[in-house]
A protein has these predicted regions:
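Bacterial N-terminal signal peptides that target proteins for export
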Residues: 1-10
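N-terminal Sec signal peptide cleavage junction
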Residues: 19-20
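Eukaryotic extended interaction platforms
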Residues: 24-29
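Solvent-exposed serine/threonine-rich low-complexity stretches and specific carbohydrate-binding patches
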Residues: 33-35, 84-90
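Short, surface-exposed binding/anchoring microloops in extracellular/periplasmic proteins
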Residues: 38-69
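Exposed aromatic-hydrophobic patches
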Residues: 44-49, 95-102
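Noncatalytic modules at the cell exterior or secretory-pathway interfaces
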Residues: 53-60, 102-119
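Short, surface-exposed beta-strand/strand-loop-strand elements in extracellular ectodomains
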Residues: 63-86, 122-130
Length: 131
């Protein structure tokens, strides 16, 4: 009986410490670049490079206007090309997350073919984040 009681007395603090430990926090998004988007169809490149680190996800966020994206091409560190499928329309303040293939990948650059939609009234800014 003393052995059971002693074992419980040792295990309870360990269990409580484990329950009180905070959950691991998600890595914050790192701003990789921004571009102002014109009303006509435009092409831009955001150079990223190995110095920025390795990423599992990229996130595109539209600011101050609505962006219509026709093509997004991501050149990975090893030269592989990744193209998320479909056309994207991002409203003001809206973002879209792109999961990169594989585990942590370095990114050389991201190519965009896009335009601001006139109905929003002003040119949009697109921000690229990684984590």
């Amino acid at each position: 009986m003393n052995t059971v009681r002693r074992t419980l007395c040792l295990m309870v603090p360990l269990l409580l410490a484990g329950a009180c430990a905070s959950a691991p926090r998600a890595h914050p998004w790192v701003l990789l670049g921004q571009r102002v988007v014109d009303f006509h169809v435009d092409h831009d490149i955001i150079e990223v490079g190995r110095a920025e680190g390795r990423f599992r996800e990229l996130r595109l966020v539209a600011h101050q206007g609505v962006v219509e994206m026709y093509d997004v091409r991501i050149t990975l560190g090893d030269g592989d090309l990744f193209r998320p499928e479909g056309k994207l329309v991002l409203d003001r303040g809206e973002g879209r997350t792109i999961n990169l293939p594989g585990d942590h990948r370095s990114v050389r650059n991201v190519n965009f073919v896009y335009r601001s939609l006139r109905g929003a009234g002003q040119r949009a800014t697109i921000s690229l984040y990684g984590r």
